[in-house]
Each structure stands twice: as C-alpha cells, then as structure tokens.
Amino acid sequence: MGERSSAKARLIDVELDETVGRAPPDVEHERAVAIFDLVEENTFHPVGDQAGGPYRLKISLIDSRLALSVTREGGDPVVTHMLSLTPFRRIVKDYFLVCESYYQAIRSATPSQIEAIDMGRRGLHNEGSQTLMDRLNGKIEVDFNTARRLFTLICVLHWRR
C-alpha cells in the first residue's frame, strides 16, 4: 500500500444488511466476532481513492448480487461495488456442509476426526477468502485476514437468505 497510512487505509465500521433476516444464534455469533475482529485489525482501501479513509462498509444483497457500499467516516459516499455471488456459491455451500459436520463432530467424534474436519473447513474458508480477494482486485485493496473476515460475513448473508 506504499505511502498510505494504515490509519487511513482501514475500516472503522462494518454493517450487515439487517433486512435479509436473522440467522441462528451460532451464526449471529460468528457475524459479531468477524465484525469485531475486522474493525480491530484490517487493511482496506478503495483503489483510486486519493482522500483516504478511514472507511465505513455496508454489506448487502441487491438483486442477488453482493453490494459493498463504502463511505467515509462522516458518511460521505466513496464507492459501491456490486459483485456476482456466482463464484462464491459452491464454496459457501461446501463450507456450510463442512461446518455442519464440524458441529456434529464436536459432540461425538475423536479429537483427530474433529481436527481433520476443521482443517477442511479452514481450507474452504481460505479458498473463499482468496476468491474474494481476486474479485476485489482493482476495486478494493485488502489483506488476506481482512478478506477472511469479509468472507465470513458473506457466508452469514448467504445463511440469512
């Protein structure tokens, strides 16, 4: 990110569209943790924005597309990017299946079985995070940890639909 200060190339607030509905408590907990972690530590800069942040981000679904609406700290609009959800569908579906297996395994499986399922879960999460980084390339600069937390929020939106 070069000369941009990390204090300016970051998110200070993340909001998920509440009109999509609520997810089960464990999914809502994941949402809250992802947002907390994201605001605490992130790298986020809309490409071409010379003024810099910090930024606020609203994530929503519009016409079955992912909408990332970026504003400045004071609320002035910066940019809205619309992304197709198609590249994420298989990953999210597989991720949910593995998560379901993971939560079932916690109750009855051996530690090595739980660890194997968790490795698969993390692998899918990493794949989704990389896909998001690829889709944001040329639009918004993010680091991998920021992409991971944003992917978690995309999964929450999918769950709510």
Swiss-Prot record:
Protein name in the entry: UPF0262 protein Meso_0189
Family listed: Belongs to the UPF0262 family.
Family matches, as Pfam families: UPF0262
InterPro entries per UniProt: UCP032146
Highest taxon listed in the record's lineage: Bacteria
